[in-house]
Amino acid sequence: MAINAIIFNSARFLGPAVAGVVIARISVGAAFAVNAATYVIFLIAMLNMRGLPALPVGATQSVLKASAEAYVYASRHPGIAPMLLLFTVTTIGTRGFVELFPGFADSVFGRGPEGLSMLTSTVGLGAICGALWMLLRPAIAGLTRLVLAHTLVISLAILAFTATDRFTLALPCVFLAGTAMTITGIGAQTLLQAAVDIRMRGRIMALYGMIFRAGPAVGAVLMGSLSERFGLRWPLAVGALISCGFWARTRLKQRRMAETLEADPSVAPVRQPG
């Protein structure tokens, strides 16, 4: 997972840097054309994959029933439930800040496309550093504490980002946020996969993936709408403060969460739904 994060965030670091140059020297349309061309390479790689193992097919089940079972399982788990709830709040409250970079780069810092490229690339660079650090971390013990601590770091970094008018101070803030986001993302995914019953793993990870992808988008839309009335800073700052509040609430459950998330699920089973 750490290697996957390194690859993903390397692209996130290099992509905006290239896009900034293409937009500045050619046009926005040219940047989209280059982006589309990269997907062709991905499709060719997918078509050339061979020898994948066949997975056993279980009894068919309706999507609604399978989703309901996953929700019940997650809500009854003393580690997964608070982790997913905190992750939901923080993804909506803080992680959409990357989608707001165009507004900050132009309206707040007055840097235009090149400033946008620098902000996005700095987040990606921080994410790579976080992934490399997680790659060198050998054990799952203590991972719950690490994830919760860096969840707070994200919120504090975003608060500092919204409080400054200086571009040179904003860059370290987004670097720190990018580092913490990757550490929490890899850490939470590792804990969930380790703790969940194998029969529910796919559905729980799908729930995690839905939160991971939809949360920032929902947060960006919500904060973008509020920014028309309150400006860019206040909605993002309030989202970070709400995330801090949920972090404090979840922190009280850290010991119990660690006992279940860092243990073998066969040793500490969760009562199955139904």
Where are these regions (language model features)?
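Alpha-helical transmembrane-bundle signature of multi-pass membrane transport and export proteins
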Residues: 1-274
